[in-house]
Amino acid sequence: MAKVTNRCFEATGHTAFICDFSPPRAGDPESFPQPNLDTDFISVAYNPGKAVRVNSAMLAAAIRGKTGKDVLFTLATRDMNKLALESLLLGGQMFGLDNVVVVQGDPFTERDLTRVKDVSDFTPTQMITAIADMNLGTDYRESQLRTPTGYCIGATLDLGRGIEAEATLAHRKAQAGAQFFISQPIFDVTEASRFHEAFAAASGQELALPVFFGLQVLEQDGIIFSTVPGTVKMELEDGRPGVEIALELYQDFQEAGLHNVYLVPPIRRGGARGYAATREVLAGVKRL
């Protein structure tokens, strides 16, 4: 199985795509979701919408086993203690998984907390450190593992929370052991250059790790979690196809030298995803 750092633009000289993929809300093997997405990697999300869904690592292993696609799985620190998280990572190792993305997980509301507990035994940065330690053969108790793990560790960025603050946090994550970054969708490519400048200012050196900047495929009636410019919203409302908007933004990415792309399919009410539109975008990219 390929590691993200071996398939990114910096390693190959070719644009690399990671595509987000939501686990189903059923474990019936007969309803196994077929991604059918021509991307370098399928990234299995962690319980989108804070809903009960198939475990991200298990689904990633199933996708890899049934389709041969290279995969990532997302792991949230919110829901498990150190023992559970590190045990899950050993299970992923057993199934040949090599790429993991560490997130905190969306915070629970007060209503949520009447039914479920926030564990947060690790912060995301601490979890990154712990995985890096497991790669060296040591668990959270400082006991030796029989076999070190070999995870390629991903961390996340949300430039909408403030570029300078996010750059400082990214520096800490890189120091902890992150090997690549995935960002929430951006619509202004200058945010990428400003992030790199802020990272250099915070760390004293340029960021040498690959960053997969988010490119969201929009639909008129879809749910939008990222900050979308008013002009783009107006274009959608006026009937411009989201696929067309995404392809135009992809060209902006290319002109700005952003050759690692995190593709986010449309999100529909109820949690369904618009993978058909995503396939149109990928087909359009090949024609450019």
Regions found by a protein language model. Give the residues of each.
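Active-site mouth loops of central-metabolism enzymes
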Residues: G13-P29, V71-L83, Y151-A165, G230-I245
